[in-house]
């Protein structure tokens, strides 16, 4: 058995199946476990999915505007710190990566609602 097969087998055990399916353009709320000292709490990060990556270690990028400043956060899909993901809204987009939203402000950054 080669090294890559061993790695694939280990990552297959850690794969999460409880998360909903979502696509770039969807507005999601990601509940993340935050550990402060000996306490643990949940923190929500709500924004638009601007990209997903697949492969052995899939991840997705969520962008939001906080106090007029753009904030992006990259989440590993199979991470244990993600408690749950809620899909709030779906948008109709024609791109897999929505990096062009970084340059847009205000109403120009809106996405069309999916039917």
UniProtKB/Swiss-Prot annotation:
NCBIfam families, alphabetized: rplS_bact
Chain ranges passing through the membrane: none
InterPro entries the UniProt entry points to: Ribosomal_bL19, Ribosomal_bL19_CS, Ribosomal_bL19_sf, Translation_prot_SH3-like_sf
Keywords for the protein's UniProt record, in alphabetical order: Ribonucleoprotein, Ribosomal protein
The protein's role, per its UniProt record: This protein is located at the 30S-50S ribosomal subunit interface and may play a role in the structure and function of the aminoacyl-tRNA binding site.
Tagged with keyword Ribosomal protein: yes
Any one Gene Ontology cellular component term annotated for this protein: cytosolic large ribosomal subunit
Similarity annotation: Belongs to the bacterial ribosomal protein bL19 family.
UniProt record, GO biological process: translation
Name by which UniProt lists this protein: Large ribosomal subunit protein bL19
A GO molecular-function annotation: structural constituent of ribosome
């Amino acid at each position: 058995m080669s090294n890559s097969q061993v790695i694939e087998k280990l990552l297959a055990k850690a794969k999460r199946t409880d998360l909903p399916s979502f696509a770039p353009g969807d507005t999601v709320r990601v509940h993340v476990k935050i550990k402060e000292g000996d306490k643990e709490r949940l923190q929500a990060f709500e924004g638009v999915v601007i990209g997903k990556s697949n492969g052995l270690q899939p991840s997705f990028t969520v962008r939001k505007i906080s106090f007029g400043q753009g904030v992006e956060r990259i989440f590993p899909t199979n991470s244990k710190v993600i408690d749950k993901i809620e899909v709030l809204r779906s948008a109709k987009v024609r791109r897999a990566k929505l990096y062009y939203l970084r340059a847009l402000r205000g109403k120009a950054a809106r996405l069309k609602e999916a039917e």
